[in-house]
A protein has these predicted regions:
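PP2C/PPM-type serine/threonine phosphatase catalytic domain
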Residues: 1-229
């Protein structure tokens, strides 16, 4: 297993509210967590950093418990500190052990699997526009430029309880898992993500994708973690 990660402020934002952490555990286990904060400059950064810190401490536990613990910490902080009221963050937390991928997420940060068959989005966006697409009110193409595209329906820290999606699958040799914030997916097409990660130079994947997002406008913070199996 190989892992590489990077975050970038982008070309427009004045601060970076994204956060990530990644690492390896004994026995060939690798893990990563990516968060995209919201709630103003102070609150968004605190929310995403708190989620990452809690995940870092508890990654050996089940991922669902990790995310629930992070949610409680962010929510309590939001309620007790006036300047942080309303803060929250997306989260994607992943762990790979013995070819098994375990994934938990909330919000519109994404995970992709890149294999010999192509690229597959593993997460479903918890967003207003995704709900509209699924109800036939928008096409995927219309959703990209919709004025409500950045409104998410799930986030850590918004309420005392958090509903997450859980995914598990067996990986094949050569597979790559990409975890990213919408600073990448709003500016780089899925096919371009695939084309940028098809060779064996895994250590370049995060740089390549962030560079693509910045070349296409870089209108948001960009965070990418690549886990190559």
């Amino acid at each position: 297993m190989k892992i590489v990660a990077k975050t970038d402020q982008g070309k427009v934002r004045k601060d970076n509210q994204d956060s990530f952490a990644a690492g390896e555990l004994p026995g060939g286990v690798v893990w990563a967590v990516v968060c995209d904060g919201m709630g103003g400059a102070a609150g968004g950064s605190v929310a995403s950093q708190t989620a990452v810190k809690m995940s870092d401490r508890s990654i050996k536990n089940l991922l669902t418990s990790v995310v629930e613990n992070a949610n409680s910490s962010i929510y309590e902080m939001s309620c007790s500190v006036e300047s942080l009221n309303g803060m929250g963050t997306t989260v994607v937390a992943a762990m790979i052990r013995d070819r098994e991928l375990y994934l938990v997420h909330a919000g519109d940060s994404r995970a992709y699997r890149i294999s010999q068959e192509g690229i597959t989005q593993l997460t479903r966006d918890h967003s207003v526009v995704q709900d509209m697409v699924e109800h036939g009110e928008l096409t995927q193409e219309q959703a990209k430029d919709h004025p409500r595209k950045n409104i998410i329906t799930r986030a850590l820290g918004v309420s005392a309880d958090i509903e997450t999606d859980y995914y598990q699958d067996t990986l094949d040799e050569g597979d790559v898992i990409i975890i990213c914030t919408d600073g990448l997916t709003n500016y780089v097409e899925t096919d371009d993500i695939y084309n940028a990660t098809r060779d064996n130079h895994y250590y370049e994947f995060a740089d390549r994708l962030i560079n693509l997002a910045n070349e296409n406008g870089g209108g948001d913070n960009i965070t990418v973690v690549a886990m190559a199996f």
